[in-house]
């Protein structure tokens, strides 16, 4: 192991070691150079912050809540959104207490109905019986309860497809446009303007981005869904323009569905055995407008990187594991609609947050504007288990000794534990490829093995009762840089 580390360290030194979230791999790069470059691909501060937060709430809310469907038609009467009150304080208390750090609201789903009083469409909550502004209310509650706020804005828009004067796929040409477009009687407090070559729908979309980013911030995440009920007129999205606007107005925000964060590949809470954040792209992600859904089991292993056709780009792109607490994304009823158990939520949390990804758990409010007692009870129990398990590191006070293979720990008193947590120093790149946990019981005995580490790796195994344990690094891309090792007991 020591010899391997010295070899890789020498390789890194010879590469002049520039780092960044994207590095090119040249056609003549040797295998060892490819792996050395992969180590130097590191997250942006915004990506690192999102990863370290780990746990976020998804809130699907809108006309579908009242019609009982998952995807609306775009021709719904706004009056179906018959909301009397939205108790966004209740939402945020529940989210905070379970340990979530961020809330993402569906400000506009595929139906095109907007939850805020937009200057640019009449198809929204402002045309419904509800006189409030759900986006504003939730953003205020997030600030009150110490949560970050983000929004989901669907590129798909069935209303703009179906309306007689709809802008989606209307065949308009890209011409010089100013964002935001001035609307008489509705000035912006933020007086900045931006010029782009846009068609009608991209202008409409960016005007709404401007509203959300300037009037409801600070915004920590912008969520772009890749799903489309259907398309029309060959409509293309000018994501590079969207990105420029987001970076200008919300420089601390990450963008989901593009180069900052990617989809985990399913909506069922399944996780990969090895979730790598450094993955290969055939094109430079900085110039890409569309990002395909990545569903392969292996996205970033050594074998995957070394079989990628050159040249290519190595890019840092963490996964978000999005899953709903209910059977469906929107609330339908409190009788027949299934709700996940606390066991299930705790299991998904351990596998996602503890598997080098971010957990985005959807908790949809009902027609009364509140989160159902069924959902809140599950979250309260799952939150209790997370706090009681992961709030007590059993290795505090241990004597640690670095070895040629990893690290050995000796406790003053025997501990009972069945979880091991490793974290890497993200500023030093993804290095560990596999590791083993050994315990001392009349000699060293291997208990469990894990794959890559990244931000956080939680290893689960049968309960142990020991005074000594060690972590052996079985394979690594460079000298391991572990930030922490912890042990816990899940009852």
Regions found by a protein language model. Give the residues of each.
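Extracellular Ig-like/FN3 beta-sandwich strand-entry sites
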Residues: 464-466
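Mature catalytic domains of secreted/periplasmic carbohydrate-active enzymes
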Residues: 19-461, 472-483, 488-489
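Sec-dependent signal peptide recognition
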Residues: 2-7
């Amino acid at each position: 192991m020591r010899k391997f580390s010295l070899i890789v360290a020498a390789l890194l030194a010879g590469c002049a070691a520039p780092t960044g979230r994207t590095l090119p791999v040249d056609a003549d790069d040797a295998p060892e150079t490819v792996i050395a470059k992969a180590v130097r691909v590191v997250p942006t501060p915004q990506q690192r912050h999102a990863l370290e937060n780990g746990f976020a709430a998804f809130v699907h809310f809108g006309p579908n809540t009242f019609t009982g469907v998952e995807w609306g038609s775009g021709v719904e009467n706004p009056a179906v959104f018959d909301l009397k009150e939205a108790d966004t304080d209740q939402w945020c208390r529940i989210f905070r207490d379970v340990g979530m750090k961020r809330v993402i609201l569906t400000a506009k789903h595929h139906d095109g109905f907007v939850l805020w009083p937009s200057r640019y469409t009449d198809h929204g909550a402002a045309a419904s019986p509800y006189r409030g502004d759900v986006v504003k209310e939730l953003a205020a509650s997030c600030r009150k309860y110490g949560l970050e706020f983000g929004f989901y804005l669907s590129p798909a828009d069935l209303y703009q497809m179906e309306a007689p004067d709809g802008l989606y796929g209307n065949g308009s040409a890209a011409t010089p446009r100013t964002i935001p477009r001035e609307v008489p009687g509705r000035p912006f407090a933020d007086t900045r303007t931006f010029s782009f070559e846009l068609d009608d729908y991209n202008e409409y979309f960016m005007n709404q981005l401007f509203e959300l980013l300037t009037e409801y911030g600070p915004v920590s995440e912008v969520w772009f869904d890749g799903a489309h009920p259907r398309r029309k007129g060959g409509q293309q999205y000018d994501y590079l323009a969207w990105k420029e606007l987001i970076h200008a107005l919300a420089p601390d925000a990450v963008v989901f569905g593009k180069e900052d964060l990617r989809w985990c590949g399913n909506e069922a809470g399944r996780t990969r055995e090895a979730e790598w954040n450094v993955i290969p792209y055939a094109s430079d992600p900085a110039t890409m407008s569309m990002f395909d859904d990545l569903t392969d089991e292996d996205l970033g292993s050594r074998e995957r990187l070394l079989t990628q056709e050159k040249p290519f780009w190595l890019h840092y792109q963490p996964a978000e594991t999005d899953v709903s607490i209910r059977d469906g994304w929107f609330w339908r009823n409190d009788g027949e609609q299934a709700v996940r158990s606390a066991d299930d939520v705790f299991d998904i949390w351990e596998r996602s947050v503890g598997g080098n990804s971010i957990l985005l758990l959807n908790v949809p409010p009902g027609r009364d504007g509140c989160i159902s007692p069924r959902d809140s009870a599950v979250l309260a129990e799952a939150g209790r288990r997370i706090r009681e398990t992961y709030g007590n590191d059993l290795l505090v006070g241990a004597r640690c000794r670095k070895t040629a293979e990893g690290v050995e720990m000796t406790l003053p008193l025997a501990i009972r534990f069945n979880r091991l947590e490793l974290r890497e120093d993200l500023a030093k790149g993804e290095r560990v490829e596999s590791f083993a946990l050994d315990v001392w019981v009349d000699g060293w005995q291997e208990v469990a093995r894990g794959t890559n580490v990244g931000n956080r790796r939680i290893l689960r195994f049968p309960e142990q009762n020991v005074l000594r344990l060690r972590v052996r690094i079985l394979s690594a891309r460079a000298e391991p840089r572990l930030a922490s090792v912890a042990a816990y007991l899940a009852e």
